[in-house]
A protein has these predicted regions:
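Metal- or metallocofactor-binding catalytic centers and their adjacent structured scaffolds
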Residues: 5, 40-108
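Anionic group-transfer/hydrolysis microenvironments
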Residues: 40, 52, 100, 158, ...
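Shared catalytic-loop signature of beta/alpha-barrel
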Residues: 59, 67, 213, 219, ...
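Conserved, mostly hydrophobic/aromatic
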Residues: 3, 44, 65, 97, ...
Length: 301
C-alpha cells in the first residue's frame, strides 16, 4: 500500500456574527477556516486530517511536500512522522498530516484510532465550557450561569485585559455567582502573542505571580498559558511558586520542546495539540512522560 494522491480543501464556515478571540486582540473573526487533507492510497483507501487554515501557504503544500510523501506506506507511522519532521523547514509545521495516516491504518485494520492507541471502550470524559472572548466581569458571570443551566460543571474563563485588576475582578465575579457549584479554569492566552492592534496586554512573571495568588483565593483549578510559550525558565519558576496548577503547551511543536519543558518543570498540566505539537506520535510521548512524572495531561483540541 502506498500514498497515491494528496488533496487539500480550504473550508470556510461563516459565523452568525463577529467573534473577537481573546488570543488575537483586535481581530473581528467572521469566518471559521480550516484546511482539510485527503490522502488516497493506490488501493483506494482514504484518510482524512484537518489543520489550521493558512490558505496561502497551504495552497502549494501538495506540490511542496507531496514528493516527500507520494509512494510511502501510510501505515508506517514512524517513518511518516520522521519524514514530516524532516520537511518542516519547508514551511509551517505539518504534523497534522500524520492523522490522515492513522485514519488509513485504522480502516485497514478495521479499528478506530483510539483502539490503535490502546484506549479502552466505555470510558467517559467530562467536558467543560470554554469562553472565547474577553467580557466585563458581570457580563461574564451571567454567561457562566447560563452555561451552568445547560449542564456544564466546569468553565474556562478568558483574561486578557490591560488592567490586571479587571482580570481578577472577572474571576471573583464568576466565583461569587456560581459559589462552589462549578469548577473554574482561566486562560490568559499569553503563549501566542499575535495582535492586530498596536498594543496588547502582555504578561511578565510578576503579573502572572500576582494573578496566580488571586486565583488561589477563588479556588481556580488551573491557569493556562500565563507566559510566552518559550519562556521555559519563567514558567518553571511560576509553577514552583503558584498554588494553582499551571497549564500550557498547545502551541509548542515536537517532542524536543516538550522534553525541555518537562526537564525544567515548566508546567503542572501539559496540553500538547496533535495537529501542531508533533502529531499523535509526539503527543503520545508527552503522555507517557507525564505519567512517569505524575503530571497531568489534557491534550488541546
Amino acid at each position: 500500500m502506498k500514498i497515491d494522491r494528496i488533496e487539500l480543501y480550504h473550508v470556510a464556515i461563516p459565523l452568525p456574527g463577529p467573534f473577537y478571540p481573546a488570543w488575537i486582540p483586535g481581530y473581528p473573526q467572521t469566518v471559521n477556516r480550516f484546511t482539510l487533507l485527503r490522502l488516497t492510497t493506490d488501493d483506494g483507501v482514504q484518510g482524512l486530517a484537518a489543520g489550521v487554515a493558512f490558505e496561502n501557504e497551504r495552497e502549494g503544500l501538495g506540490g511542496l511536500i507531496g514528493p516527500y510523501l507520494i509512494g510511502m506506506d501510510p501505515t508506517d507511522i514512524p517513518l511518516i512522522h520522521q519524514r514530516l519532521r524532516e520537511v518542516s523547514y519547508l514551511g509551517w509545521r505539518n504534523f497534522w498530516i500524520e492523522a490522515a495516516c492513522w485514519d488509513i491504518r485504522g480502516k485497514v485494520e478495521g479499528k478506530p484510532v483510539w483502539a490503535l492507541l490502546g484506549g479502552r471502550e466505555g470510558g467517559r470524559a467530562e467536558v467543560y465550557a470554554s469562553t472565547g472572548e474577553v467580557h466585563p466581569p458581570e457580563q461574564r458571570a451571567e454567561e457562566v450561569l447560563r452555561l451552568r443551566e445547560m449542564g456544564f460543571r466546569t468553565v474556562k474563563l478568558r483574561v486578557h485585559s490591560f488592567d490586571p485588576a479587571e482580570d481578577i475582578a472577572q474571576v471573583a465575579a464568576v466565583r461569587r455567582a456560581v459559589g462552589d457549584s462549578m469548577a473554574l479554569g482561566v486562560d490568559a492566552n499569553q503563549g501566542w502573542r499575535v495582535a492586530l492592534i498596536d498594543d496588547a496586554p502582555l504578561w511578565d512573571l510578576d503579573r502572572a505571580l500576582h494573578f496566580a495568588g488571586a486565583c488561589a483565593d477563588h479556588d481556580v483549578g488551573w491557569i493556562e498559558e500565563p507566559l510566552d510559550m518559550y519562556a521555559y525558565d519563567e514558567l518553571a519558576e511560576l509553577a514552583s511558586r503558584s498554588k494553582v496548577p499551571i497549564a500550557g503547551g498547545e502551541l509548542n511543536g515536537g517532542w524536543q520542546e516538550f522534553k525541555v519543558m518537562l526537564e525544567k518543570g515548566s508546567y503542572d498540566i501539559y496540553q500538547p495539540d496533535a495537529t501542531m505539537g508533533g502529531g499523535i506520535t509526539d503527543t503520545l510521548k508527552v503522555l507517557k512522560a507525564c505519567g512517569e512524572r505524575g503530571l497531568a495531561y489534557t491534550p488541546h483540541t
